[in-house]
UniProtKB/Swiss-Prot annotation:
<comment type="similarity">
    <text>Belongs to the UPF0161 family.</text>
</comment>
<feature type="region of interest" description="Disordered">
    <location>
        <begin position="68"/>
        <end position="88"/>
    </location>
</feature>
<keyword id="KW-0472">Membrane</keyword>
<keyword id="KW-1003">Cell membrane</keyword>
<protein>
    <recommendedName>
        <fullName>Putative membrane protein insertion efficiency factor</fullName>
    </recommendedName>
</protein>
<dbReference type="GO" id="GO:0005886">
    <property type="term" value="C:plasma membrane"/>
</dbReference>
<dbReference type="Pfam" id="PF01809">
    <property type="entry name" value="YidD"/>
</dbReference>
<comment type="function">
    <text>Could be involved in insertion of integral membrane proteins into the membrane.</text>
</comment>
<keyword id="KW-0997">Cell inner membrane</keyword>
<dbReference type="InterPro" id="IPR002696">
    <property type="entry name" value="Membr_insert_effic_factor_YidD"/>
</dbReference>
<feature type="compositionally biased region" description="Basic and acidic residues">
    <location>
        <begin position="75"/>
        <end position="88"/>
    </location>
</feature>
């Protein structure tokens, strides 16, 4: 699923974004943010973070630097615990 979402973002960046121009008020751009969020957090959480970011990108927003949050150590610990329980 991650691969499909990233491919769609790449298509948007190559085919659609040049026609719209550079309108994002944030760094990195919303499409780059979405790609990074999906790569770091997976398809579901990454899409959620990307949608939240796009909703914040509007003419009344000051914009600025808005980096993808690092993966939560609690989430990673839960994933490792699940992986260990499946090995038993």
């Amino acid at each position: 699923m991650k691969t499909v979402l990233i491919a769609l973002l790449r298509f948007y960046k190559v085919a659609v974004s040049p026609m719209l121009g550079n309108r994002c008020r944030f760094y990195p751009s919303c499409s780059d943010y979405a790609r990074e969020a999906i790569q770091y957090h997976g398809a579901a959480r990454g899409t959620y973070l990307a949608v939240r970011r796009v909703c914040r990108c509007h003419p009344f927003s000051a914009g600025g630097i808005d980096l993808v949050p690092p993966p939560n150590s609690d989430t990673r610990a839960r994933g490792e615990a699940d992986a260990r329980s499946h090995r038993l």
